Amino acid sequence: MSTPAILAEDLHKSFGETHALAGLNLAADEGTILGVLGPNGAGKTTAVRILTTLLKPDSGRATVAGLDVVKDAAKLRSQIGLAGQYAAVDENLTGKENLEMVGRLYHLGRAVSSQRADELLERLELTDAASRPAKTYSGGMRRRLDLGAALVARPPVLFLDEPTSGLDPRSRIGMWEVIRQLVRTGSTSVSYTHLTLPTILLV
């Protein structure tokens, strides 16, 4: 039996008297999309911060891509992509420069970083804005650029926080198609949102 791409067992995390997680268990197989739904304050962000090595659990165990999120944190960071709710881009760099920079941070060669940047800009319908500084982008364009940054290294596991927040219907459909293409190659995607399932399907 293969090891799940993501596995969490009895995760607990508290902040003072607030219990953010109280025995979380979840599993996602390779090449699937896992949706984590819940209202604000339900612990979704806390769970993902633990799974992406940004926060240590109080107790319990979790592995991502076969690596322990605590013991193998440094190695695991090269195996995941993370696109947050708020676009984390350098406003003074162009769209292409942002993606190339991420590629270099993942130790990709200059030529590979440039090629992947061009491919992602096209898939995310940002080619016409590739040479413009990110500070001139609309909110939706920044969201797409942020997703592109998470995809540059073609990570086996991708975490998405409210992936379609602030996007118009066409951009939402396009973004989900990019995510599905990645999953078809064997990657695993975790999307966490407060939207209900019918709402997600409509957009």
Locate each region found by the language model:
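Walker A (P-loop) phosphate-binding loop of ABC-type ATPase nucleotide-binding domains
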Residues: 39-43
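Conserved ABC ATPase "signature" region
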Residues: 100, 104, 111-129
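Conserved small/polar residues in nucleotide/adenosyl-binding loops
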Residues: 193-199
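Conserved catalytic motifs of ABC-family nucleotide-binding domains
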Residues: 154
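Catalytic Walker B motif of ABC-type/P-loop ATPase nucleotide-binding domains
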Residues: 158-161
